[in-house]
Curated annotation (Swiss-Prot):
GO terms for biological process: phenylpropanoid biosynthetic process. This is Dirigent protein 4. Keywords: Apoplast, Glycoprotein, Secreted, Signal. Belongs to the plant dirigent protein family. Residues 1-20 form the signal peptide. Glycans are attached at N67, N126, N169, N180.
Length: 186
């Protein structure tokens, strides 16, 4: 009985594979042209009251070799919703915001590892954003961070953002950073 059942199951499996059809519609595709876009804006990171745009959400209880008087000691985690503007003046035209997190990841050299979505809320890029996931050595006046993605007009973007510290208050951590971004996208 068991032998016959095995033969019947094998027979049905063979028929299923022989008669089963896989349907797929094949369409010719023409690759889209790669587009290069250059963006320029200012990022305002404010840690101080009365209206902070970045807040400390976790801080280590103790770290070795770290300066505890730093506004972002090693191991600190921050959430941010920072405004993006056309100019360095905080009152200049707002074009979007940067939302995400960064962690103080440099034990001896002040460094942030950031993952931030830069969303644009006005102009021709309204509703689009770029994603940055990179190391940011904040004591260097000029540095680069990697653009690893995007959405909207910047779908599948990749590129680099060159950062230039326009202003920084080393006591409280407030900063204004100029971004020059080169994007490659479709």
């Amino acid at each position: 009985m068991g032998k016959n059942l095995g033969l019947v199951v094998s027979f049905y499996l063979c028929i299923t594979f022989a008669l089963g059809e896989y349907f797929s519609e094949t369409r010719p595709i023409t690759p889209k042209q790669l587009v290069v876009t250059n963006l320029h804006f200012f990022f305002h990171d404010t840690l101080t009251a009365p209206n902070p745009s970045a807040i400390l959400i976790a801080k280590p209880t103790h770290t070795r070799g770290d300066n505890d008087s730093s506004p972002s000691p090693f191991g600190s985690l921050f959430a941010l919703d920072d405004p993006l503007t056309v100019g360095p003046d905080p009152k200049s035209e707002k074009i979007g915001n940067a939302r995400g997190m960064y962690v103080s990841s440099g034990k001896h050299v002040p460094t942030l590892t950031m993952y931030v979505d830069f969303g644009f809320t006005s102009g021709k890029f309204n509703g689009s954003s770029i994603a940055v996931f990179s190391r940011n050595t904040i004591t260097e006046k000029e540095r680069e961070v990697a653009v690893v993605g995007g959405r909207g007009r910047f779908r599948m973007a990749r590129g680099v953002a060159q950062l230039n510290t326009y202003y920084v208050n080393l006591t409280n951590g407030d900063a204004i950073v100029e971004y020059n971004v080169t994007l490659y996208h479709y």
